[in-house]
Amino acid sequence: MEVSREIIEKLEIFQKLVKKWNKSINLVSGNTIHNFWQRHILDSLQLMQYIDNKEIHLVDIGSGAGFPGIVLSIAGVAKVSLIEADLRKCIFLEKASKISNNNIQIINQRIEKVAIDCSILTCRAFSKLNTIFNCIKNISVQEKVLLLKGKNYLTEIVAAKEMWLFDYLIHQSITCEEGKILEVSNLTKII
């Protein structure tokens, strides 16, 4: 995955900020700090290969430490809205948003209460598919939902298919053998 020197420098600044704030508000698991670049930065950055047009509005739910939302903004996504219920994490996200040259909006609310339109929605390390789909029912996603998932992704798909109609593609993560990227479109709740 090729990125410019400027983007790498900004991602390194972001990495330092996450590590600094992690001491006080536990943004990422302590056992991932030693492998930070692959575990967090590249894991988020790999989503860029599924974003055809950078001039979009992307919504990242449960943004926490800014993965993948801040990383995708630094990589060139024009407008990113980060939805996070924890005020302390929103304060961190506000600081981190200054690293990007692009438009970042921080929304300090529970996801279920946010009504917003976007081209693409992302989330990472948030919840099971059914929970995610229920949380985003007020968010109008025009194009697709990109989800970074772990080894239980197939079980989650089967369970979600009982309550939702959707199309999906499964992509292999470049950072983890068990990791998958689910690309979901045409999401509709079964009545």
Swiss-Prot record:
Matching Pfam families: GidB
Any one annotated GO CC term: cytosol
Coiled-coil residue spans: none
Organism superkingdom: Bacteria
Top class in the EC scheme: transferase
UniProt keyword annotations, A-Z: Cytoplasm, Methyltransferase, rRNA processing, S-adenosyl-L-methionine, Transferase
InterPro entries per the UniProt record, alphabetical: rRNA_ssu_MeTfrase_G, SAM-dependent_MTases_sf
Keyword hit for DNA damage: no
EC number: 2.1.1.170
Annotated residues for binding of S-adenosyl-L-methionine: G62, F67, I111, E112, R124
The reaction(s) this protein catalyses: guanosine(527) in 16S rRNA + S-adenosyl-L-methionine = N(7)-methylguanosine(527) in 16S rRNA + S-adenosyl-L-homocysteine
Subcellular location: Cytoplasm
An MF annotation (GO) of this entry: rRNA (guanine-N7-)-methyltransferase activity
PANTHER family: S-ADENOSYL-L-METHIONINE-DEPENDENT METHYLTRANSFERASES SUPERFAMILY PROTEIN
Biological function: Specifically methylates the N7 position of guanine in position 527 of 16S rRNA.
NCBIfam families (UniProt xref): rsmG_gidB
Family the entry assigns: Belongs to the methyltransferase superfamily. RNA methyltransferase RsmG family.
Protein name: Ribosomal RNA small subunit methyltransferase G
Taxonomic source organism: Rickettsia akari (strain Hartford)
Species classification: Bacteria, Pseudomonadati, Pseudomonadota, Alphaproteobacteria, Rickettsiales
Gene: rsmG
